[in-house]
Amino acid sequence: MGSEINDNTIEFDVLKNKEDLTKEILNEVYNSLKEKGYNPINQLVGYLISGDPTYITNYNGARALVRKLERDEILEEVLKSYLGIK
């Protein structure tokens, strides 16, 4: 009864998971910056242009989170979202 075997193959979509991870991290970083009283968009733009992580607060581990992503990958996902490209 509880030992039925599922013969279906589960597909793992690396690109979709990367998009989800990027969005999740950016949302967490945005919220942390906002909670600390910063303008989150200005701070994120400063970080993306300069690569200087001090634009991002350490609050809630936001700086460590954003550094898990490559800046070019963040920009790629932001542009895809803005242009409505999947």
UniProtKB/Swiss-Prot annotation:
It comes from the Bacteria. Pfam families: IreB (PF06135). InterPro entries: IreB. Belongs to the UPF0297 family. This is UPF0297 protein CA_C1679. It comes from Clostridium acetobutylicum (strain ATCC 824 / DSM 792 / JCM 1419 / IAM 19013 / LMG 5710 / NBRC 13948 / NRRL B-527 / VKM B-1787 / 2291 / W). The lineage of its organism: Bacteria, Bacillati, Bacillota, Clostridia, Eubacteriales.
